[in-house]
From Swiss-Prot:
One of the record's GO cellular component terms: cytoplasm
Family that this chain belongs to: Belongs to the prokaryotic/mitochondrial release factor family.
Function: Peptide chain release factor 1 directs the termination of translation in response to the peptide chain termination codons UAG and UAA.
Organism of this sequence: Bifidobacterium longum (strain DJO10A)
Pfam families: PCRF (PF03462), RF-1 (PF00472)
Location of N5-methylglutamine modifications: 240
Principal place of residence: cytoplasm
Keyword Protein biosynthesis in record: yes
Coiled-coil zones: none
GO-annotated molecular function: translation release factor activity, codon specific
The protein's name: Peptide chain release factor 1
Keywords in alphabetical order: Cytoplasm, Methylation, Protein biosynthesis
Amino acid sequence: MADEQFPAAATALEEYQSIEEQMASPEVVSNPDKLRKLGRRHAELGAIVDAYKAWLQVKDDLAAAQEMAGEDADFAEEAKRLEDELPGVEEKLRTALIPRDPDDARDTIMEIKAGTGGEEAALFAGDLLRMYTRYAEKRGWSVNVQSENTTELGGVKDVQIAIRAKGTPAPEDGVWASMKYEGGVHRVQRIPVTESQGRIQTSAAGVIVFPEADEDDDEIEIDPKDLKIDIFMSSGPGGQSVNTTYSAVRMTHLPTGITVNMQDEKSQIQNRAAALRVLKSRLLAMKHEQEAAEAADMRHSQVRSLDRSERIRTYNFPENRIVDHRTNYKAYNLDAVLDGDLQAVIDSDIQADEADRLANQK
């Protein structure tokens, strides 16, 4: 029996069909939050179901061809072709069954902070913001700046953005599936605009990423008593006030000390809601990292943080070179990468992660 060889795939198919029935019910259709959660799980199971159905089809066709092979040479030839095809289809199914990061289909919150290097570091942080914005545009994602602290020269001291996909993407197409590899220290080597002697300077910016929680995510519960909320005026370049009302929000989670600033929305109420969602996202990421550590899941730990205190990438302007130090990826198209052509760099991280997961599965 097919389900005896791949019981997990058979179970996935049953769940997939059950979810399709639920998503068609009026109760779910009228509940956007529930529909989104079911849609995410449906997309997550889709790759397994497609691979399983393809494997079942080849198995059935092979059995039928073998039955007729003794009577017809064409069927014998077809049986041989299907026998050659079966191992590849089976390998695709085994790969699809390897557990993915459960957050892959989620959207992403990203923080970019200027590090060592003064104004040059802030300018580089601004370059990273533009790079990720253009990359997101190429992927058809939206970018929402939630808070930003800029310098007079146009640099970025720190910025927080939400990167979101349209609809409910398959896990491999989710924002987190790609952006989770960006967390870490990014180093730049170039001649700063403020350098009169033409000397190359090294500076850095830090990137923190975490999957965005749903507004009604019941995995994380926050007691209002654990929150300290400060209200202030939004600030623009150089710290200048950009409005005359106190609509910006600083939300502090007292048990963990996590602080979230939100000033992008038009009203204090909207900023409170947005800040709470970001706080939930950070607590969710913290919870998942703790669970991974307790389970000694080294793959998940590597993917989730890749040690954010370490340098992960170097951007060398004089040589137009970019290097990813985790995968040894190197290319001489830095100008294109900074214009959003980032996929090849990210793919090197995805491929290394998939190879690691496959090795751990065997």
